[in-house]
A protein has these predicted regions:
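A detector for small-residue-rich transmembrane helices and their helix-helix packing motifs
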Residues: 2-161
Length: 161
């Protein structure tokens, strides 16, 4: 075995560590906001409003309630773990691009109002996993693409107005 090779167990550990780190942060924000009634949701992404620019960075951490948070958690856990497991060398870069681009696009073209939740990242993860699996001509990654379409294909309907 090559000194630079990585075992499946190490890949899984890496994937779960990065996934858990983000989930702990969004759950932590939700619990603190709920416990102390801070009203943090006003800091969401408000498209085309100067005061909404900070929301590009904050909106994925804010959720309207436990059901909203749970729905984002379940999808995020699966898709993010797949990204970090199968695309280890690209994962951090892809994730950061999705984080910033989803927030910026929402600010530029989103509907009026205050947008909160990690759905933009979830849509980005699903899109990347699907497209990457199709264009890489790799049977395993193509299978992952099909799983993503099967499990999350309905996400596209939530993006349309």
């Amino acid at each position: 075995m090559n000194a630079n090779s990585i075992t499946d167990k190490q890949r899984l550990h890496f994937a779960l560590l990065f996934t858990a780190a983000f989930l702990v942060s969004i759950w932590g924000v939700f619990i603190i906001d709920s416990a102390f009634e801070l009203g943090l949701n006003v800091h969401g992404n408000r498209p085309r409003e100067i005061r909404g620019l900070k929301g590009i960075l904050t909106y994925p951490f804010l959720h309207s309630g436990i059901e909203h948070l749970w729905n984002n958690t379940a999808s995020f856990f699966t898709l993010n773990a797949l990204l970090f497991y199968f695309y280890r060398s690209l994962a951090v870069r892809v994730w950061l691009i999705m984080f910033f681009v989803s927030g910026a696009l929402l600010w530029l073209i989103g509907g009026k109002g205050n947008h909160i939740g990690a759905s933009g990242i979830v849509y980005g993860l699903a899109s990347f996993l699907f497209v990457s699996g199709v264009i890489r001509n790799n049977l395993l990654l193509l299978r992952i693409s099909l799983v993503v379409v099967f499990l999350y294909g309905g996400l596209v309907w939530w993006m349309l107005p």
